[in-house]
């Protein structure tokens, strides 16, 4: 596994709306110490971002788009990722219309498989990012089991999210081990209990309740290529949150 910890820019989405803000964000992330990133949540063109990323020594390892964009603009996704020098084309999540039934899960798989195959022909990979709904059961089987078993392991990879695995009732480390190298990237996202009503929420890595020693070991054993810090909801300045997570993980042996 790449020991350089990554920054998921979705955490910083409010700070990547303009090219000027994007440059400031890249500078701050570089100053924290991050060397790899995921591009997500920004409307900016790859051609405009790439020189800035290069200036601050930031390597893009994955991106995120919604499924409708994959369906309608696959050539653009291929061009976008190639411009950024990034081989993993991430899907942010299954569209709502596919989440309602076993039949619709099958329809998503039927539509996603040829997209993943086309990306592989272009030298890229399709990466499915999980939430918790994939652990709904239809007909006695998880949606996730169908995503694993009815897709091509050579084409259809996963961007595993530790927080959403825990919310879905899964052990993140055990799930990563089960996935092996199909888990091409992992979002390191912690979970803490917000209040006495037992409301779960996201936290800086190391500030919550997940077992990070076991998760990190699982990533190493499974052959995960990249680990990226993500925190959709921050309760302080998001750059401070990103630094806290970075400091925790560098103490665990990341760079």
Task: Enumerate the predicted regions with their spans.
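N-terminal pre-domain/capping segments
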Residues: 1-87, 181, 254-255
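Conserved, mostly hydrophobic/aromatic
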Residues: 7, 29, 37, 53, ...
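Active-site beta-loop-alpha junctions enriched in small/polar residues
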Residues: 8-12, 40-42, 64-68, 94-96, ...
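Charged helix-capping and loop-helix junction motifs
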Residues: 20-24, 74-75, 104-112, 140-145, ...
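Active-site acidic/histidine proton-transfer and metal-coordination neighborhood
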Residues: 47, 55-59, 67-158, 167, ...
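Acidic/histidine-rich catalytic cores of soluble enzymes
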Residues: 121-209, 216-218
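H/E-rich (His + Asp/Glu) clusters that bind or coordinate divalent metals
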Residues: 208-216, 222-230
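C-terminal helical cap(s) of enzyme catalytic domains, especially alpha/beta-barrels
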Residues: 237-255
């Amino acid at each position: 596994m790449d020991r350089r910890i990554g920054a998921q820019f979705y955490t910083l989405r409010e700070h990547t709306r303009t090219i000027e803000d994007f440059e400031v964000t890249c500078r701050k992330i570089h100053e924290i110490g991050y060397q790899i990133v995921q591009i997500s949540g920004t409307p900016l063109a790859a051609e405009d971002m790439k020189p800035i990323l290069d200036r601050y020594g930031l390597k893009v390892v994955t991106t995120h788009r919604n499924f409708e964009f994959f369906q309608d603009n696959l050539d653009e996704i291929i061009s976008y990722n190639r411009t950024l020098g990034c081989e993993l084309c991430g899907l942010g999540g299954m569209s709502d219309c596919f989440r309602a039934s076993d039949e619709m899960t099958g329809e998503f798989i039927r539509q996603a498989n040829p997209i993943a195959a086309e990306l592989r022909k272009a030298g890229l990979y399709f990466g499915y990012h999980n939430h918790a709904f994939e652990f709904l059961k239809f007909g006695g089987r998880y949606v996730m089991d169908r995503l694993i078993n009815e897709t091509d392991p050579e084409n259809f990879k996963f961007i595993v999210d530790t927080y959403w695995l825990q919310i879905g009732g899964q052990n993140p480390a055990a799930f990563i081990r089960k996935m092996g190298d199909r888990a091409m990237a992992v979002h390191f996202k912690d979970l803490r209990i917000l209040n006495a009503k037992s409301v779960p929420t996201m936290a800086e890595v190391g500030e919550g309740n997940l077992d990070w020693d076991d998760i990190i070991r699982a990533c190493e054993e499974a052959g995960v290529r990249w680990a990226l810090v993500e925190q959709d909801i921050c309760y302080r300045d998001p750059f401070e949150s990103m630094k806290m997570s970075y400091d925790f993980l560098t103490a665990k042996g990341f760079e």
